[in-house]
Amino acid sequence: MKCPFCGHAATQVIDTRMSEEGDTVRRRRRCESCDRRFTTYERIELFFPAVVKKNGSRVDYDRNKVKDSMRLALRKRPVSAEAIDEAIARIEEKLLSHGEKEIGSDRIGELVMRELKRLDKIGYIRFASVYRSFEDVSEFRDMLDEFRQ
């Protein structure tokens, strides 16, 4: 690997460690020319399906959009950041396991709702009330009745 300090092509790996999650390899390297040390990280490159929005446009999957929407729904609720990250990991696992090149934003919304329902009932209701775009109180009441069953 090329040294970021002097540009020399020959570097030596002096230490390799696996992350706790097992998805990243951390390597300490030493340049054979300038003798400086640096760290590199090796991760699996995942290709998520393109997201097809309601208007038909396509955008890249964005983990941060999912995370932000879940955080908003769970604002001031007793749910840890770690629990949110684990829920997102389950959502992403489902997205990758289907092996499809495209997925509708509505499908992602349903996956988010399923995870929120497991994490926090109030967060689920908050998200569903925005996601489902209720027109009147009766639709909201129907959703609550469905939720109680």
Curated annotation (Swiss-Prot):
Listed InterPro entries: ATP-cone_dom, NrdR-like_N, RNR_NrdR-like
Co-factor binding comment: Binds 1 zinc ion.
Keyword ATP-binding: yes
Residue spans, zinc finger unnamed: 3-34
Entry cofactors: Zn(2+)
Highest taxon of the lineage: Bacteria
Gene Ontology biological-process entries: negative regulation of DNA-templated transcription
One MF annotation (Gene Ontology) recorded for this entry: zinc ion binding
Keyword Repressor: yes
ATP-cone domain boundaries: 49-139
Keywords of this entry: ATP-binding, DNA-binding, Metal-binding, Nucleotide-binding, Repressor, Transcription, Transcription regulation, Zinc, Zinc-finger
Family: Belongs to the NrdR family.
Function recorded in the entry: Negatively regulates transcription of bacterial ribonucleotide reductase nrd genes and operons by binding to NrdR-boxes.
Protein name, per record: Transcriptional repressor NrdR
Annotated source species: Ralstonia nicotianae (strain ATCC BAA-1114 / GMI1000)
Organism ancestry: Bacteria, Pseudomonadati, Pseudomonadota, Betaproteobacteria, Burkholderiales
